[in-house]
């Protein structure tokens, strides 16, 4: 419901371009019940366009993967880097983490519209900052000594990302019209995803995500964002 206006605008824009979008909404988080229902509805579609938060983007990526369709992601917040990564997390209808699926590729196109993302509640950017900051601590602990060139590049990108967020994030949260907001939002939603793409599981196989996934089993934690 919180993104209804943006979704309606997107539908109108697509129709104005002569396209015939079929709209589908998730009843749960990225859940098998929703995925099976939407897959049946989308069997004659040419592509999957996912617009929303991280779980909507995860669902769109996984749906496109299963249907062998091109995938376009449109993040409506900077709360995670889900719009850029080749990974989807699956949850139960109750919101508990069940597992993740490694996809064969990243989305074919990511559209990061500052105007859309600015409409998201400030707490979503705060969540994105926390999620992106964690990339350095996860990557440096799990793969700081790796001899793999791409992994080392991911680790160093995570360090630069951390420094950028420590400089800009407070100003960004106070002033969404500032250049600091642009740098911070792009760092959270875009750069953090590149780190995940280069480093993969080797840059996140530490306690942080395991603790997060365990906490999703508790109903009392379901109002808390990923970051």
Describe each model-derived feature in a short phrase.
Residues 1-47:
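ATP/NTP phosphate-donor binding region
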Residues 4-7, 55-61, 81-84, 204:
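Short glycine/serine/threonine-rich phosphate/pyrophosphate-binding segments
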Residues 9, 13-17, 62-66, 214:
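Alpha-helical structural signal in soluble globular domains
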Residues 42-63, 67-78:
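A short, small-residue-rich loop immediately preceding and capping a beta-strand
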Residues 54, 133, 209:
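Short, conserved catalytic/metal-binding motifs centered on acidic residues
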Residues 65-157:
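A glycine/threonine-rich phosphate-anchoring loop and its flanking beta-alpha core
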Residues 147-227:
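Active-site segments that bind and position negatively charged phosphate/pyrophosphate groups
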